[in-house]
A protein has these predicted regions:
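Metallocofactor- and cofactor-centric catalytic cores in central/energy metabolism, strongly enriched
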Residues: 2-280
């Protein structure tokens, strides 16, 4: 029977081999496919930003942060809102089309970099693509519905299993999961005003390389190791952000007894959110 979805990015995946009907985490097949599409479109955008950098053109912080948040949004249990993923895919496509217009060399770009969610019929009548996708993002009725149908169809073709060679597939996904972890460090560092163009550029160039069918297994292994190395740089950036903003942790005595006062249970490690909560 054909899989309704395929996801094996967490340690709790069904049968230790992959969720194919429904996510153990609670993720639906529709949501899993839309996450696949978000990763696919983010790879395409990253290929364009990498090419822009090669041409000596600047990539804005807004674009860097869009890519970071796209990756972060797909990590296990981060977000289960279908509509969020539709909107992020549309925003990513709109951003990519805007940047493609600034790109001098469009030779040999991948299908992911060029795909735009507009049908051939609409292209034939010279639809204003950027306007159309932005209209869809804003929710203009019929246009939004048509775009969503195209996204749904595309999402069934770009998942993990689209790479047929198991070894290549596994290495690509290992790299992508490393980049997702890196995006978490970057997202939290960005929230405190810290950033790194070098890490952003690496993440995007590496995403683009997962589209390259010419890379060998040895080259992908080397890229996996490099991803781990840059991941340590991401951890260092986050540590600098945390300690630079809040100081270094100190051994502190706290009351662990029970009182009648209301309390707030905090889970996670977004210190900026915790700071804002404590200030309320």
């Amino acid at each position: 029977m054909e899989n309704k979805m395929f996801c094996y990015q967490c340690q709790e995946t069904a049968g230790c081999s992959g969720c194919t009907k429904f996510g153990v985490c609670g993720k639906s097949p529709d949501l899993a496919r839309m996450q696949d599409l978000l990763i696919y479109t983010t790879k395409g955008l990253s290929e364009v930003t990498t090419r822009l950098r090669e041409e000596g053109k600047e990539v804005s912080k807004d674009v860097n942060h869009l890519i970071t948040i796209n990756l972060f949004t797909t990590i296990t249990n981060a977000n289960f809102d279908d509509e969020v993923f539709y909107q992020r895919v549309k925003e990513t496509l709109a951003t990519k089309e805007d940047l493609l217009a600034k790109l001098a060399n469009k030779e040999n770009l991948s299908e992911a970099a060029l795909w735009n969610a507009v049908s051939n019929e609409e292209m034939d009548v010279k639809v204003n693509l950027l306007s159309k996708i932005k209209d869809a993002i804003l929710g203009s009725g019929k246009e939004e519905s048509n775009i969503d149908k195209i996204l749904d169809e595309k999402s069934t073709k770009v998942g993990v299993l689209a790479t047929k060679d198991e070894d290549i597939r596994s290495l690509r996904e290992l790299i992508i999961y490393g980049l997702k972890g890196m995006s978490a460090y970057m997202k939290h560092a960005n929230a405190l005003g810290y950033d790194s163009e070098d890490i952003n550029a690496f993440m995007q160039a590496t995403l683009a390389k997962t589209l390259d069918d010419n890379l060998s297994i040895d080259e992908l292994i080397a890229l996996t190791l490099e991803t781990g190395k840059v991941g340590v740089d991401g951890m260092a950036l986050l540590d600098s952000a945390n300690t630079g903003t809040y100081g270094h942790p100190e051994i502190t005595k706290v009351n662990i007894g029970v009182r009648n006062n209301p309390g707030i249970l905090v889970s996670g490690h977004d210190l900026k959110d915790l700071e804002l909560l404590l200030k309320q």
